Swiss-Prot record:
PROSITE patterns: PID, SH2. Residues 215-378 are annotated as: CH1. Residues 29-214 form the PID domain. Residues 379-470 form the SH2 domain. Predominantly expressed in the adult brain. GO terms for cellular component: synapse. It comes from the Eukaryota. Interacts with the Trk receptors in a phosphotyrosine-dependent manner. Once activated, binds to GRB2. Interacts with activated EGF receptors. Keywords: Phosphoprotein, SH2 domain. Residues 1-27, 308-328 are annotated as: Disordered. Signal peptide: none annotated. This is SHC-transforming protein 3.
């Protein structure tokens, strides 16, 4: 199949830039750059990519490529003999959707979305907003003509979508996706109003696929900043001072911090881009050496992770303690507010700490004091499933706290608002108890604060008021 590139506004073919070079910013910021590729289908991803280390994410996308290629007749990536996937990968990947498999499509990449549609009828196959895309990668040495990206949509929930990009086009496609991530972040720094607000971004997390039973980490919990201690600004640390009275605290009620899910940490799309190697290579979205071309081993493919910048002041500590300190996964969300405070509007970060050896962070086990304090509270039910908790709610304002059966070491606030049950995770993986505006010294502190002040807990554009505790049975 001929792999060509054309503008979305018209059918005039655009001259292809040197291999690996970016497109003009106006193209990606505006109508987007369109490639004619082949869509092979998608395969369900049953776990959040945030919960996986970088190596596992890459294995997931490459296993997805292999599986879909084997299922689609005539796909070049199908291997006659290959090792069976590990049990871990088998547990992450689910069912395949081959409805449009083998169809020639127009893939339009812009800072707004990845749009897949048929070139003739203009039927939209999928339209994935950038905020819903978490990971993108090329294939392994045997599947270099393939690109895979993980995104959420109402039809396939979280799925890995596979594209066949012949004639060496795969690197251009993956490079354009990375460029879109980069420009989207720069766009925010120059004009925050152009990037969707929190409520708009969180709409993708309010869909049915984020139910706690099968997908706890991606539920719209109000403390959705995994693997991080609370950022330096944007909320009040309630542990450092006396508990405020309700009028004083009212200024924080309903205040939402805006989060952005991604940018490339290195200045990959700056001046060094023109000197980037033209062969198929591996580009870790997390890091690019300062002032140097990122030369990479042959046989690996570009990989992009929709992640967030680290403040410049972090780099000295990160680079000086790489041998003595374990490296954490930077695949998290951090407030734009802090990014603006810590990052100038000039050149983007050109230096990044390597995170090649990252590993998933598991929640800290609750300490004995916390458990003792919780057991003394009438609204604490102990270990309880989501379904059992919902059965105890009768009217708006009813609430309880339970130990999660699906997220080990996690505690969940379950309450009813407008006749609908809400489930909010109370402790993040670092053991911090917090809302988007405040951090508390215990779960009891958080619950009693909102109960006594009558302040609602704001999450994903909705509110949860704590009024009637559901007491546990003796």
């Amino acid at each position: 199949m001929s792999a060509t590139r054309k503008s979305r506004a018209g059918d005039e073919p655009l001259p292809r830039p040197p291999r690996g070079a970016p497109h003009t910013s106006d193209q990606v910021l505006g109508p987007g750059v369109t490639y004619v590729v082949k869509y092979l289908g998608c395969i369900e991803v049953l776990r959040s990519m945030r919960s996986l280390d970088f190596s596992t994410r890459t294995q997931v996308t490459r296993e997805a490529i292999s599986r879909v290629c084997e299922a689609v007749p005539g796909a070049k990536g199908a291997l006659k003999k290959r090792k069976p996937p590990s049990k871990m990968l088998s547990s992450i990947l689910g069912k395949s959707n081959l409805q449009f498999a083998g169809m020639s499509i127009s893939l339009t990449i812009s800072t707004a979305s990845l749009n897949l549609r048929t070139p003739d009828s203009k039927q939209i196959i999928a339209n994935h907003h950038m905020r819903s895309i978490s990971f993108a990668s090329g294939g392994d040495p045997d599947t270099t003509d393939y690109v895979a990206y993980v995104a959420k949509d109402p039809v396939n929930r979280r799925a890995c979508h596979i594209l066949e990009c012949c004639d060496g086009l795969a690197q251009d496609v993956i490079g354009s996706i990375g460029q879109a991530f980069e420009l989207r972040f720069k766009q925010y720094l120059q004009c925050p109003s152009k990037v969707p607000a929190l409520q708009d971004r969180m709409q993708s997390l309010d869909e049915p696929w984020t139910e706690e039973e099968g997908d706890g980490p991606d539920h719209p919990y109000y403390n959705s900043v995994p693997t991080k201690m609370p950022p330096p600004g944007g909320f009040l640390d309630a542990r450092l001072k006396g508990r405020p009275h309700a009028p004083e605290a009212a200024q924080f009620a309903g205040k939402e911090q805006t989060y952005y899910q991604g940018r490339h940490l290195g200045d990959t799309f700056g001046e060094d881009w023109q000197r980037a190697p033209t062969r198929q290579g591996s580009l870790d979205i997390y890091s690019t050496a300062e002032g140097k071309t990122h030369m990479v081993p042959v046989g690996e493919t570009p990989t992009y992770v929709n992640t967030q910048p680290v403040p410049p002041q972090v780099w000295p500590a990160a680079t000086s303690s790489t041998e003595s300190s374990p490296r954490k996964d930077l695949f998290d969300m951090k407030p734009f507010e802090d990014a603006l405070r810590n990052q100038p509007l000039g050149p983007m970060l050109s230096k990044a700490a390597s995170v090649e050896c990252i590993s998933p962070v598991t929640p800290r086990a609750p300490d004995a004091r916390m458990l003792e304090e919780l057991n003394a509270e009438p609204w604490y039910q102990g270990e309880m499933s989501r379904k059992e908790a919902e059965a105890l709610l009768r009217e708006d304002g009813d609430f309880l706290v339970r130990k999660s059966t699906t997220n080990p070491g996690s505690f969940v606030l379950t309450g009813m608002h407008n006749g609908q049950a809400k489930h909010l995770l109370l402790v993040d993986p670092e053991g911090t108890i917090r809302t988007k505006d405040r951090v508390f010294d215990s779960i009891s502190h958080l619950i009693n604060y909102h109960l006594e002040s009558s302040l609602p807990i704001v999450s994903a554009g909705s509110e949860l008021c704590l009024q009637q505790p559901v007491e546990r049975k003796p």
